[in-house]
Amino acid sequence: MANITAQMVKELREKTGAGMMDCKKALVETEGDMEKAIDYLREKGIAKAAKKSDRVASEGMTHVISNEKHAVVLEVNAETDFVAKNDNFQQLVDALAKQILEVRPDSLEDALKTEMPNGQTVQDYITEAITKIGENISLRRFEVKEKADNSAFGEYIHMNGRIGVLTLLEGTTDTTVAKDVAMHIAAINPKYISREDVSTEEVEHEKEVLTQQALNEGKPANIVEKMVEGRLKKYLSEISLEDQPFVKNPDITVGEYVKQSGGKVVSFVRFEVGEGIEKKEDNFVEEVMSQVKK
């Protein structure tokens, strides 16, 4: 059995950042081989990271970056808001955005398999970050957009990455207009670009609801149709970007504002951290008891 010295433990701690007892155990298990001990700790770290993966990651941040031809918006999740504000986490998000912008994978599964500049796969890069940061982290989603020459990307990040928006305008290269539209989308959260994009099924469903509302209000049948028509028009304008009053100048619509620059909104992506994720609510008593039993 190798003689494990305090200096060896100290050196391993400095190289890995692991705890003293973990380092000592790693050296004992690998008979004092420093490189094997590092591998041992990495393997244990990965095992720990895998164990953390059943925890809900509903915090995090969005990020938007672009180059001359392409842009990406993505969401990376963590478990707590505290970690989301951590410099290491923010650097990770930026690195993932740059990787996706460079490689432009077709799917999340493909993205996780791509190779980072340091030779690691994206999945391994994230797993290593989980070990260092101590929380479950996941690349949740991303979208990549491509633009032509006479087009503009608009990028807007709200509340330190809580909301990220990417817009694509055609017919103009005015990035200020594109960014203004992105800011509007962050604030108002439209569902569609124009009312023409709303499906017939959704329109008919809303019409049925509004008709029933009007009838329940006791309105005469002869004016119900006109009421429904007016309310439906209002509903469509509320969910359609081009029809919405522009946040920076409510006297004009977003469509009118964009048209002033000769442009047209052709797409937008709005990511809000954690939307659609059900947060796990632990029972406080159970949480305390689980800590006592450890």
From Swiss-Prot:
<comment type="function">
    <text>Associates with the EF-Tu.GDP complex and induces the exchange of GDP to GTP. It remains bound to the aminoacyl-tRNA.EF-Tu.GTP complex up to the GTP hydrolysis stage on the ribosome.</text>
</comment>
<dbReference type="InterPro" id="IPR014039">
    <property type="entry name" value="Transl_elong_EFTs/EF1B_dimer"/>
</dbReference>
<dbReference type="GO" id="GO:0005737">
    <property type="term" value="C:cytoplasm"/>
</dbReference>
<dbReference type="Pfam" id="PF00889">
    <property type="entry name" value="EF_TS"/>
</dbReference>
<dbReference type="InterPro" id="IPR036402">
    <property type="entry name" value="EF-Ts_dimer_sf"/>
</dbReference>
<protein>
    <recommendedName>
        <fullName>Elongation factor Ts</fullName>
    </recommendedName>
</protein>
<dbReference type="GO" id="GO:0003746">
    <property type="term" value="F:translation elongation factor activity"/>
</dbReference>
<dbReference type="InterPro" id="IPR009060">
    <property type="entry name" value="UBA-like_sf"/>
</dbReference>
<keyword id="KW-0648">Protein biosynthesis</keyword>
<keyword id="KW-0251">Elongation factor</keyword>
<comment type="similarity">
    <text>Belongs to the EF-Ts family.</text>
</comment>
<feature type="region of interest" description="Involved in Mg(2+) ion dislocation from EF-Tu">
    <location>
        <begin position="80"/>
        <end position="83"/>
    </location>
</feature>
<dbReference type="InterPro" id="IPR001816">
    <property type="entry name" value="Transl_elong_EFTs/EF1B"/>
</dbReference>
<dbReference type="InterPro" id="IPR018101">
    <property type="entry name" value="Transl_elong_Ts_CS"/>
</dbReference>
<keyword id="KW-0963">Cytoplasm</keyword>
